[in-house]
């Protein structure tokens, strides 16, 4: 039974680490770029788009479709980076128990 108590303590500690990691992630921002840096978007840790920066040379008549495509590409770049950062933070928080958590609902590793 000692082992069970130790396992429960480990699980509670990991749960706290995961909650802390999720809180840090909520405050995290990532940038995604496209068009060789002509468009940059910033996402919060929850995926919310909070900023779009564009090179002024893009703001010309007839460039609307190009701008839209570049924004979408920059968003996809930022989302990919955010997903990688989320996975790494959760992996780090779970520590040696990460392998056990992969099969649990709601746990992304």
Curated annotation (Swiss-Prot):
Keyword check for Metal-binding: no
Protein's cellular compartments: Cytoplasm, Nucleoid
GO cellular component: bacterial nucleoid; cytosol
GO molecular function: DNA binding
Keyword terms of this UniProt record: Cytoplasm, DNA-binding
InterPro entries: YbaB-like_sf, YbaB/EbfC
Subunit comment: Homodimer.
Job of this protein: Binds to DNA and alters its conformation. May be involved in regulation of gene expression, nucleoid organization and DNA protection.
Entry's family note: Belongs to the YbaB/EbfC family.
Protein name as catalogued: Nucleoid-associated protein CCNA_00269
């Amino acid at each position: 039974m000692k082992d069970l108590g130790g396992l429960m303590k480990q699980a509670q500690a990991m749960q706290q680490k995961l909650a802390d990691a999720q809180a840090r992630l909520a405050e995290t921002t990532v940038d995604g770029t496209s068009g060789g840096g002509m468009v940059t978007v910033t996402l919060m840790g929850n995926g919310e788009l909070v900023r779009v920066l564009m090179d002024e040379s893009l703001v010309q008549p007839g460039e609307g479709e190009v701008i839209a495509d570049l924004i979408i590409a920059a968003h996809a770049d930022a989302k990919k980076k955010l997903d990688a950062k989320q996975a790494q933070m959760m992996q780090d928080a779970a520590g040696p128990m990460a392998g056990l958590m992969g099969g649990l609902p709601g746990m992304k590793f």
